[in-house]
A protein has these predicted regions:
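Extreme N-terminal starter segment of soluble prokaryotic enzymes
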Residues: 1-3
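Conserved mid-domain beta->alpha element of the FAD-binding
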Residues: 5-21, 133-134, 247-328, 332
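Conserved Rossmann-like nucleotide-cofactor binding loop
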Residues: 11, 36, 139
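Glycine-rich FAD pyrophosphate-binding loop
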Residues: 20-41
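C-terminal helical "tail/cap" subdomain of flavin- and related membrane-associated enzymes
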Residues: 21, 296-413
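Conserved N-terminal glycine-rich FAD pyrophosphate-binding loop of Rossmann-like flavoproteins
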Residues: 35-53
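Conserved N-terminal helical subregion
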Residues: 48-165, 369, 373-386, 412
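Conserved FAD-binding catalytic core of PHBH/FMO-like flavoproteins
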Residues: 105, 128-249, 253
Length: 413
């Protein structure tokens, strides 16, 4: 099969790797419009479930990724004016640029033709391909050409956020919340290589405007943020990968859904097909899962239309719950003042429960009361709820047992 992948992110590269491993006779070209080594963001975060998927589908690149990743241990939630809370958990961070380098090197070693500075803006440029894989991100040009068939919907979130980095080490995944004269502002931080940590800053638009962050020059905005988070940075500075017109590249998260993921011989994967809010930390894992699922569908079916239809249905079903929880998580942070007025342990419980549909629909105190009642009911082995499992999803699978008993491997970011 002749395959053209447009976009050399994790989804496009890993699909090429898996397909080439399954059948070396496939002719696969990956087109990337940017020069080699170009990337956005700093580090990405993942857990053992992704490593297991990588080891199953390509042990060689999985081992390299595991060797390059930086483990972090535990999570910390630090609300200014209250004692920090610690949560037992663990995961990994890795430099996004290094992750892409590993995947490019592996793809090349398998015989994939990876072409940088190769811009594909029209489907006619890859018309000779049997299969065209659009892995060109949330602003996919290829998707735009078939918008009437894919029927994408993009919804911009309310909060402002920016991906920064710092030389301050964060050995635990850390949330820090700081009040300002314009409202609350917070960060999510984790180490991704020795001496460098990702530092994502988020706030409501009123806080962003009130602090002047949208109008300041990049250097002044960084100094303002360094001052706000001085206790956490401990003398270390903040770094931005780029600025637009001497301004920091603040964003509003765009949630993307498509009615269908394939049209004729064009199929969407990764951020071209879907996005999930960064506060659930699933973007890289979902991109890899798309790649593996597409390769599997192509191997299982003897016709391209049936394979693409099976892939689309399988992944859209798998994504439905994740996307719903991501929306709830984003909305929780957009309504932070509703929750942060509670003491630190209660706030942490609400943070862990942010994917609960019930929490969104009722006052926090009512939710906490019902959750306590539910916990007591299910504590007894004789309880009917305990025997059948009960409506756990309504109380948040991570929150129903409280902070210390939250399920392992399901962090609060």
């Amino acid at each position: 099969m002749r395959i053209s992948c447009v976009g050399a992110g994790p989804a496009g590269l890993y699909f090429a790797i898996v397909m080439k491993r399954r059948n070396p006779n496939h002719e696969i070209v990956v087109h990337e419009r940017n020069p080699a080594g170009t990337t956005h963001g700093w580090g990405v975060v993942f857990w053992d479930d992704l490593l297991a998927t990588l080891r199953t589908n390509d042990p060689d690149s999985a081992q390299t990724i595991a060797d390059q990743a930086v483990p972090w241990s535990g999570q910390v939630v630090d609300v200014e004016g209250q004692p920090p809370l610690h949560y037992v958990d663990g995961g990994y961070g890795i430099c996004r640029r290094r992750l892409l380098q590993i995947l490019v090197e592996r793809a090349l070693a398998l015989g994939v033709d990876v072409r940088f500075e190769s811009e594909i803006s029209e489907l006619s440029q890859v018309a000779d391909a049997d299969l065209i894989v659009a892995a060109d991100g949330v602003a996919s040009r290829l998707r735009r050409h078939r918008a009437d068939q894919f029927r994408p919907q993009i919804e911009a979130g309310r909060n402002k956020y920016i991906w920064l980095a710092t030389t301050q080490p964060f050995p635990s995944f850390t949330f820090g919340f700081v009040p300002t004269s314009a409202g609350w502002i917070w960060f999510h931080a984790y180490s991704f290589k020795e001496g460098v940590s990702t530092f994502i800053v988020e706030c409501a638009p009123e806080t962003w405007d009130g602090l002047g962050l949208g109008t300041m020059r990049a250097d002044a905005a960084l100094k303002t943020l360094e001052s706000i988070f001085a206790k956490h940075l401990d003398g270390h500075g903040l770094m931005s990968r780029d600025g637009h017109g001497n301004r920091l590249p603040w964003l509003s998260f765009r949630t993307l859904v498509n009615r269908t993921w394939h049209a004729d011989n064009v199929v969407l994967i990764g951020d071209a097909a879907h996005t999930t809010h960064f506060t659930i930390g699933s973007g890289t894992r979902l991109a890899i899962d798309d790649a593996v699922a597409l390769a599997s569908a192509l191997s299982e079916h003897d016709s391209l239309p049936r394979a693409l239809d099976a892939f689309s249905r399988r992944r859209q079903r798998a994504l439905a719950r994740v996307q719903r929880e991501a929306r709830l998580s984003a909305e929780w942070f957009e309504n932070l003042p509703r929750y942060i007025r509670y003491n630190a342990p209660t706030f942490f419980t609400l943070l862990l429960a942010r994917r609960s549909r019930l929490l969104k629909r009722m006052p926090a105190r009512t939710y906490l009361y019902l959750r306590r009642k539910y916990t007591k009911l299910t504590a007894s082995a004789a309880s009917p709820l305990a025997r059948i499992g009960g409506p756990a999803h309504r109380f948040g699978s991570k929150a129903r047992r409280g902070i210390s008993g939250a399920e392992p491997g399901t962090p609060c970011h």
